[in-house]
Structure formats: C-alpha cells, structure tokens
C-alpha cells in the first residue's frame, strides 16, 4: 500500500469494539480525517456509538446526532460528545450558525431526503464553516471479488444482481459517481470546495474477506445493541487481527481509490 490506510494505532483502538470488516473501513476514514483541519465546535452527523468521534476528534465541544435511540445511548456512554441529539438530520432543529465543522461519516447516503439534511447542516454552520462528508462511490461494490468473478463468468446482468443486493443490504438511498455528487451539492445551500476519491479497492477487498465472520457482530448488535461482548479479549487479539487485515490489504494490492468520495463543502460567507 502506498499510503497507510490501516495503522495499528487506529486499529487497536477500534477492534475491541467493532468487527474486523468495519474496522478496516473506519480506520481508513480515520487516516483520511487526520489530513484535515477540524475546528470546534464540531457536529458529527450519524454519530452512532461515538467510537469514531472519540478517536478522531480532540475539540472540546463535539455534538453528535443520530436517529437511533439505542446508538444515542451508547454515544452518551462513550463520553465523546458534549451534547447528543436524537433525531433525523433532515428534520431536527440545531443551533443556527454554531458549528465550525461538520463531519458525516458515511451517513448521508442513508438519509432519504438528503437535500433537507444538507440544508440543516448548512444552517448549523458558521459562515465559512466546513463540512467533511464521506459518501460512497456508486460502483464501490463492483470491486468485490465475488462480483468481479460473477461478471467474468456470467456477464454483467448476473453480477449486477449481487452488486445491487449489497447496496440494498447496506440501505444506500444515494449512490452516485463524482458528477452525481457534484450535482447533489450544487442543489444544496452549500458550496463545493473539493471532492476527492478516498479508500482504495484494497480496503473493499479486505472488507469483503472479513464480511462473513463480521456478520456475527452485526447479529450481536441486533440482539444486544453492541458489536462485541468481550472487548478485553478482543484487545488482546488485536495484534493478530491487525496482521491478518494488513495481509489481506497486501494481497489485494490495489491502491486505486474507488470506494468513497470525501466531499469538502462549506457554508458560503456572507457578503461584507
């Protein structure tokens, strides 16, 4: 890998509380976040259990918002946030012109009314405040080895059935290429500062490799609201799991950024 999408520092903090497949993707986003200038107060959209924010942010004031009350309780317990808001980002009322930074970590693609969500974010930012939005590439699932194998053996129609099924499983309401995401932002009150591809094909291949065993964590979350039950044991196993994850990234050996986009947008400054 030409860039450290997966480091032990991030992995060892994430792995005790999340399945391997999720760790790989989240750690790659963490590395991308470390290249950004993030100033508080911060709004974390789709904050989940708060683990990402606890590792990523050092600001004194971080607010989290999530539509899921169970996730909100875990977020509160994480002590990563000064405030937790339970509600739909497309409908909730937030303090106007309050946040200097907003981060949406692969959450907006799950919001049916994405324009309403972007309007809420814009109104909550100070003029000139920035939002960093991680969103999926329309064709991210086409890089799954199983999808590529089906395509080579049986053609595009058969492969697309599995590819579409993957996106349905992850409840993606919005999947666009770069031009599509540009159009989404153009229709919103926000201004596009930059858009760049992030997360390599290798992370998708590694994600797929660990997806089936990680489904046990998904089932556990449905039953208990948490990904893992024994964080202490997983912490001890983190070095071994990290070697396996890094090995899969090396086997995939594809640095092309095909999985997601990082949209850098800002609330326009008011004319003087």
Predicted regions and their residues:
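Conserved N-terminal segment of class I S-adenosyl-L-methionine
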Residues: 1-97, 101-104, 118, 246, ...
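Short, charged, solvent-exposed linker or helix-capping segments at domain edges/interfaces
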Residues: 129, 271-272
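Short catalytic micro-motifs in class I SAM-dependent methyltransferases
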Residues: 106-110
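S-adenosyl-L-methionine-dependent methyltransferase catalytic module, highlighting the catalytic core
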Residues: 112-120, 130-264
């Amino acid at each position: 890998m030409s860039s450290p999408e997966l480091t032990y520092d991030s992995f060892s903090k994430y792995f005790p509380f999340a399945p391997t497949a999720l760790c790989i993707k989240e750690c790659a986003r963490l590395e991308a976040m470390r290249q950004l200038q993030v100033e508080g107060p911060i709004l974390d959209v789709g904050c989940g259990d708060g683990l990402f924010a606890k590792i990523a942010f050092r600001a004194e004031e971080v607010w989290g918002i999530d539509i899921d009350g169970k996730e909100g309780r875990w977020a509160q317990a994480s002590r990563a946030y000064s405030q937790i808001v339970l509600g739909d980002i497309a409908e909730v009322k937030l303090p106007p012109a309050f946040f200097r930074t907003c981060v949406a970590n692969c959450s907006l693609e799950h919001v049916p009314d994405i324009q309403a969500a972007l309007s809420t974010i814009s109104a909550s930012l100070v003029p000139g405040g920035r939002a960093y939005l991680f969103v999926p590439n329309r064709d991210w699932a086409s890089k799954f080895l199983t999808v590529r194998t089906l395509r080579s053996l049986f053609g595009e129609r058969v492969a697309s059935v599995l590819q579409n099924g993957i996106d349905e499983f992850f409840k993606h309401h919005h999947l666009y290429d770069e031009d599509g995401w540009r159009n989404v932002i153009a229709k919103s009150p926000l201004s596009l500062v930059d858009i760049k591809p992030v997360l390599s094909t290798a992370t998708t291949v590694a994600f797929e490799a660990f997806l089936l065993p990680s489904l046990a964590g998904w089932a556990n979350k449905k039953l208990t609201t948490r990904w893992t039950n024994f964080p202490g044991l997983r912490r001890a196993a983190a070095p071994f799991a990290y070697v396996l994850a890094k090995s899969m990234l090396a086997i995939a050996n594809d640095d092309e950024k095909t999985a997601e986009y990082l949209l850098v947008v800002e609330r326009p400054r008011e004319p003087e």
